[in-house]
């Protein structure tokens, strides 16, 4: 009974803290947006129809935007469920109301991916979209910062570079964070502080049961996209015994590469460890090149590499210059390589459920 009482007290304090925080944010007067009629023209221009779940999430977001309270919403949906297009439409509605929008992603590759998809859809409607990432030259950065300050840019997409002190928005209306679990609370709030009470939208692909989500993110309203767009094939997940490892490499991997596809192989460690019995990426690359795939292009990616090296490897993989990419969990943040159709995860027991789900996505 004493233990239950302590657990209850902890949850009570957590919930009271979240309740007070949420009360504080909902009582703050935010921006009252209208649902601009041009948003329907953007919707019509999309090369696909939104799913019912996407429409529901979009309506919930627009409803929040139309209120004069600050929006604080979490959009949760599996990888491939179409969260990005919902974020795109929220940003578009913000710009159509005369405000600027910001989208923050955890990696340069993901930020570039968003920049390309938003530009393709929104530039024909006269919206100015720009990218701010660490790899830009000083001169390029200065030009982007100047244009944002002068409101020549409607939507700024970037990495942690967005929260630097030098970044000044003219009229920030909405802040969107992708893969929100990769950012701390302070980082997210630092971006929203660049405007006067902008609406806040955070996105995650990690599946959190609704009750747990309400405990963890009690300060947020939740929209769930629980439906995949038509034509998306379900992911087949298999557990392979260690004894069948050779067969998995020799038949599964080779078969996919011969079809012109690409393969990920994920390891829990970068280098071998005496304390942990698990596959290390650096050793596995050598093993694959010598024993299995001497005729194929095998690449290596891990967290100890410089950011520029990692981006270079991912670009090579995306451009089909690498057949098999051996990696650690640095690839878990939603990079879109449609040609990669198989992933082998070594020592899967060494990963958390959220990590496995993210990798699977």
PLM regions and their residue ranges:
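Pre-Walker A segment
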Residues: 1-81, 85-102
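Inter-lobe coupling/hinge segments of SF2-like helicase ATPases
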Residues: 28, 70-361
